[in-house]
């Protein structure tokens, strides 16, 4: 077939025009081939769009018919450009379902992307921003890097939005100028970071970002993305590391646990490791995740100290005891409450009002 039609796009192969010329000349393909001094098979393949119009063949046809050779060569170029246009349109159609799964308003609201009038515009904007040729690639769990999620059953929608959020975090992280990664400096900074749990976001965020910058960590804090499920990610780039978290659960204790969890992953130095969920993890990844969890728990509330609190609460947990312990540990009471709730010592409904919440506004 020497012409391809898709929607309102038509791609005419040069063979289409050669076939029309032969009809006008009342000439067979065999006779045309003889006059060009090429095989009849070559003309047959050309007319049937099985081969492109070569420069040599265009030159022969130009001499025989008195047609400008550039005109003939442009027929092939135009055909190829139309094919690209058709393939691009097909890809856009295939991506319509993907873009429906993504909250595009997230990017508009956070002034990351411009308002898009159509699904096609959304696709083009997202592809350029996410550095992918096709949004269907977002279905791949291993497209970027492994990520940590609290979603129990991971769906395709979760994978798509996790990849979207991850690339967004990476984009912001790569824009940050930080010093070369210094593991010792980061280890020394951990106690200072822990003290920030007693501060308000407007006070600790600039300090936290600057401290990370000195250690070679590009710290990214983003609002959570609908259907994402990702809590945080660590990704290495040469001599710096991107560490990103979001406000998916909004509670301050979850925020700080995520910070130290991701710092734990930084110290593991597994430069391509990402965790999706327990059901699909290898044992190695489970070990890495458990190790990062342990690290975060012990930094925030060392186990031995935590056990003294539990012993003192044998007759019941009171808010006064929580505040006493938090003051002793130099940490926000909400972090103690969150740990007690997580461990099942107290129900999630108890003292929840005492757990501070953060909201990320870009």
Ranges and model annotations:
Residues 1-362:
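Active-site hotspot residues in diverse enzymes, especially metal/ion-binding acidic/histidine motifs
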């Amino acid at each position: 077939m020497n012409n391809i039609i898709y929607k309102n796009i038509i791609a005419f192969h040069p063979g289409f025009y050669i076939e029309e010329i032969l009809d006008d000349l009342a000439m067979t393909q065999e006779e045309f081939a003889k006059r060009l001094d090429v095989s009849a098979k070559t003309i047959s393949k050309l007319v049937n769009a099985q081969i492109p119009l070569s420069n040599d063949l265009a030159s022969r046809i130009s001499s025989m018919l008195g047609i400008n050779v550039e005109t003939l060569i442009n027929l092939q170029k135009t055909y190829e450009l139309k094919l690209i246009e058709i393939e691009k349109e097909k890809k856009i159609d295939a991506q319509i379902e993907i873009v429906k799964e993504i909250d595009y308003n997230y990017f508009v609201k956070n002034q990351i992307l411009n308002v898009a009038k159509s699904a096609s515009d959304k696709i083009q904007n997202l592809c350029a921003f996410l550095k992918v040729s096709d949004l269907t690639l977002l279905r791949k769990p291993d497209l970027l890097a492994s990520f940590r999620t609290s979603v129990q059953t991971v769906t395709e929608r979760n994978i798509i939005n996790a990849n979207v959020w991850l690339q967004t975090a990476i984009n912001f992280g790569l824009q940050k100028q930080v010093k070369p990664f210094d593991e010792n400096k980061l280890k020394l900074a951990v106690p200072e970071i822990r003290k920030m749990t007693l501060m308000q976001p407007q006070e600790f965020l600039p300090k936290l970002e600057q401290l990370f910058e000195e250690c070679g960590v590009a710290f990214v804090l983003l609002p959570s993305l609908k259907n994402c499920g990702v809590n945080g990610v660590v990704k290495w780039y040469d001599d710096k590391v991107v560490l990103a978290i979001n406000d998916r659960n909004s509670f301050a204790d979850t925020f700080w646990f995520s910070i130290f969890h991701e710092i734990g992953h930084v110290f593991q130095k597994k430069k391509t490791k990402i965790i999706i969920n327990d059901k699909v993890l290898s044992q190695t990844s489970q070990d890495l995740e458990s190790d990062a969890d342990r690290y975060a728990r012990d930094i925030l509330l060392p186990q031995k100290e935590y056990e003294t609190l539990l012993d003192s609460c044998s007759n019941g947990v009171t808010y006064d005891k929580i505040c006493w312990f938090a003051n002793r540990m130099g940490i926000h009471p909400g972090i103690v409450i969150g740990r007690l709730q997580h461990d099942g010592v107290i129900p999630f409904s108890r003292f929840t009002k005492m757990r501070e919440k953060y909201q990320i506004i870009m």
